[in-house]
């Protein structure tokens, strides 16, 4: 493939004079380019919605959501996956991020890893991939062999698949059920896809994981009601969430949380339904953890 022909690799005529600009002119130029990212995302929202539905269905069926990429793309997948347990209270391993070259590649590039299609497949084999898992490949260029190899293996197993690329009609788009291709144009710094392309991928991942978790009942209204109160900040957030959801005084929210082991959902249910902690837990179990359903019983 002629990489120079990729949109993400071409020169940006608006930034030719970067090295001659004042600092303010330079950062203003970056900012103008970044404005193109949400516009590109808007054009692919239907595809993102499809991917959210696939991810939610896979997770409901007991599968996993697996992100996979090289370099910046891989790091972004690992970042999004690592935020899911504390934010949504899901177990580690439910959302997984893989990067070409393994964990060490998060800090230091592993030469040649992204060019090895067999490595992508091997990394999924090591996870004991099954057809219930969803695999999402990330590659700004849309042609990374590591990602293509993984997606082909996932497709052979019958996994739901999606790909996130910033080039139109890319090779990985032809390997998946859902292709998400926000075309953000040439980078301000030629070929540096950690810039607009990376931002676009992060925005898509935000929507994908958050949207799936909303559909799994991890959100009530716009509150993260399955947050794990693992530090002082999150204990305070848990209390504020209960107050926001119920209108109760902080002291009442703290009392309810103490009885539920600082689990937010049953604490909210206790206050709004006027029941004790045990009944709140039982009612949530009856409704598969969906707080709104438990409240409207």
From Swiss-Prot:
GO molecular function: carbohydrate derivative binding; carbon-oxygen lyase activity; ether hydrolase activity
Active site (UniProt): 83 (proton donor), 114
Keyword hit for Lyase: yes
Pathway(s) this gene product operates in, as recorded in its UniProt entry: Amino-sugar metabolism; 1,6-anhydro-N-acetylmuramate degradation; Amino-sugar metabolism; N-acetylmuramate degradation; Cell wall biogenesis; peptidoglycan recycling
EC numbers on record: 4.2.1.126
One family name in Pfam for this protein: GKRP-like_C
Organism superkingdom: Bacteria
Induction text: Induced by MurNAc 6-phosphate that releases the repressor MurR from the DNA. Repressed by MurR in the absence of MurNAc 6-phosphate.
Coiled coil: none
GO BP of this protein: 1,6-anhydro-N-acetyl-beta-muramic acid catabolic process; amino sugar catabolic process; N-acetylmuramic acid catabolic process; peptidoglycan turnover
Gene3D superfamilies linked to this entry: 1.10.8.1080, Glucose-6-phosphate isomerase like protein, domain 1
SUPFAM superfamilies registered for this protein in UniProt: SIS domain
UniProtKB keywords: Carbohydrate metabolism, Lyase
Role of this protein: Specifically catalyzes the cleavage of the D-lactyl ether substituent of MurNAc 6-phosphate, producing GlcNAc 6-phosphate and D-lactate. Together with AnmK, is also required for the utilization of anhydro-N-acetylmuramic acid (anhMurNAc) either imported from the medium or derived from its own cell wall murein, and thus plays a role in cell wall recycling.
Extra information: A lyase-type mechanism (elimination/hydration) is suggested for the cleavage of the lactyl ether bond of MurNAc 6-phosphate, with the formation of an alpha,beta-unsaturated aldehyde intermediate with (E)-stereochemistry, followed by the syn addition of water to give product.
HAMAP family per UniProt: MurQ
Summary of subunit composition and partner proteins: Homodimer.
Identification of the protein by name: N-acetylmuramic acid 6-phosphate etherase
Organism per entry: Serratia proteamaculans (strain 568)
């Amino acid at each position: 493939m002629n990489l120079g022909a990729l949109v993400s690799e071409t020169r940006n005529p608006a930034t030719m004079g970067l090295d001659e600009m004042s600092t303010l002119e330079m950062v203003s130029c970056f900012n103008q380019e970044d404005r193109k990212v949400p516009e590109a995302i808007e054009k692919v929202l239907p595809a993102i919605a499809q991917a959210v539905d696939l991810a939610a269905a896979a997770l409901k069926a007991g599968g996993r959501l697996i992100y996979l990429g090289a370099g910046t793309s891989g790091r972004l997948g690992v970042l999004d996956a690592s935020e899911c347990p504390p934010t949504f209270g899901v177990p580690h391993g439910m959302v997984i991020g893989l990067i070409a070259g393994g964990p060490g590649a998060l800090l230091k590039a592993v030469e040649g890893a992204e060019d090895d299609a067999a490595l992508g497949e091997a990394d999924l084999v090591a996870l004991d991939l099954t057809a219930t898992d969803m695999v999402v490949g990330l590659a700004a260029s849309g042609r990374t062999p590591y990602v293509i190899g993984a997606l082909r293996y996932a497709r052979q197993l019958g996994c739901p698949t999606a790909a996130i690329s910033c080039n139109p009609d890319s090779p990985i788009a032809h390997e998946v059920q859902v292709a998400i291709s926000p075309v953000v144009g040439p980078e301000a710094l030629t070929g540096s896809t950690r810039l607009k392309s990376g931002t676009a991928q992060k925005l898509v991942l935000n929507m994908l994981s958050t949207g799936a978790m909303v559909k799994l009942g991890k959100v009530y209204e716009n509150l993260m009601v399955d947050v794990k109160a693992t530090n002082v900040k999150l204990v305070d957030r848990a209390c504020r969430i209960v107050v926001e959801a119920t209108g109760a005084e902080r002291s009442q929210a703290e009392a309810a949380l103490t009885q539920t082991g600082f689990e937010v959902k049953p604490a909210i249910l206790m206050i709004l339904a006027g029941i004790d902690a045990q009944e709140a837990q039982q009612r949530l179990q009856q409704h598969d953890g969906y707080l709104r359903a438990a409240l409207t019983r």
